[in-house]
């Protein structure tokens, strides 16, 4: 699906849902800014927009249509034989966390950012793209005056989308902590390890993404106007805070795992303690039973009138004495 918008330099909507054969004409008009959004496009739509209209470099087109596990930004400057305009190609990931499945769902968003155009490409619907397009059409602050403004709004929306996911993750970690303290089971351990794996996956996404935004925050690219650099820096700072939260969650999960192992060790120790107590307390009974269970005829106690009573009394007294000694030592 292709959605397209043309805005004036004052941020007002000029036209939308533009026919592809008209896009080159609008691109040539420097008083307009063209935003083309490709959402799960067909091969023909991809070829027409990326190759035939904008003439993007084949390597960036290949990176766009193929899933890229790591965020990145690349600057393309045309040579004499090239037909494209200078542009930035960027790969960014949005995330969503499902407590039901316990996994982070990653969605890739690709940017082609030029002086008077922005092309976005994604395989699944993204709330950040939808929200930004609605803001461009309805907002009174006229954010659609230039592509670098809209790109900033998109990036800010993507980074903000991390926060609900982290809130869900925080609730999940809190539940795991309670389970580890109150009723640790094998399922609790599996859940701790799974969530820790997902947090590590999140940090692997955020790390390169921070590097990408840091380059914008430092003002490395000429296509980002100087007065917008502080806004990109603010987005980078927000992502840095999210990165710190992810590190804190990793530390929390490590602590919860240690609590689980300690609780499991304590439970095992209690079982061993109980079994040891039973074994020691019943030792006198076993000794007396074993002694008088020998099949020797010449055992005077076997013929004694009160032999049974004496053996029983000895067993009871020895068992009681053992129990009293353990109790005095506070071994149970």
Q: What is each stretch, according to the model?
A:
Residues 237-332:
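Hydrophobic alpha-helical transmembrane segments and their immediately adjacent juxtamembrane loops
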């Amino acid at each position: 699906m292709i959605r397209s918008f043309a805005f004036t330099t004052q941020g007002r909507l000029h036209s939308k849902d533009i026919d592809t054969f008209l896009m080159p004409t609008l691109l040539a008009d420097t008083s307009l800014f063209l935003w083309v959004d490709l959402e799960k496009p067909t091969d023909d739509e991809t070829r027409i927009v990326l190759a035939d209209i904008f003439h993007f470099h084949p390597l960036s087109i290949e990176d766009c249509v193929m899933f890229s596990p790591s965020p990145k930004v690349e600057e393309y400057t045309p040579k004499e034989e090239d037909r494209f305009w200078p542009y930035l190609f960027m790969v960014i990931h949005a995330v969503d966390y499902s407590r039901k499945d316990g996994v982070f769902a990653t969605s890739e968003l690709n940017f082609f950012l030029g002086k008077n155009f922005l092309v976005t490409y994604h395989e699944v619907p993204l709330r950040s793209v939808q929200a930004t397009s609605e803001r461009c059409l309805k907002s009174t602050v006229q954010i659609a005056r230039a592509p670098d403004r809209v790109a900033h709004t998109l990036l800010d929306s993507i980074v903000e989308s991390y926060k609900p996911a982290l809130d869900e993750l925080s609730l999940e970690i809190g539940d795991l902590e309670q389970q580890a303290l109150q009723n640790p089971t094998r399922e609790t351990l599996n859940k701790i390890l799974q969530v820790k794996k997902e947090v590590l996956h999140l940090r692997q996404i955020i790390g390169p993404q921070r590097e990408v935004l840091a380059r914008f925050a430092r003002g490395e690219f000429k296509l980002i106007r100087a007065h917008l650099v502080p806004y990109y820096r603010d987005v980078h700072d927000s992502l840095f805070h999210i990165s710190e939260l992810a590190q804190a969650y990793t530390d929390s999960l490590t602590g919860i795992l240690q609590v689980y192992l300690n609780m499991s060790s304590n439970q095992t120790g209690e079982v061993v303690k109980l079994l040891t107590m039973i074994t020691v307390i019943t030792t006198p009974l076993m000794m007396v039973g074993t002694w008088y269970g020998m099949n020797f005829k010449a055992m005077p106690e076997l013929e004694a009138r009160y032999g049974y009573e004496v053996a029983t009394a000895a067993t009871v007294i020895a068992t009681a004495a053992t129990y009293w000694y353990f109790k005095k030592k506070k071994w149970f």
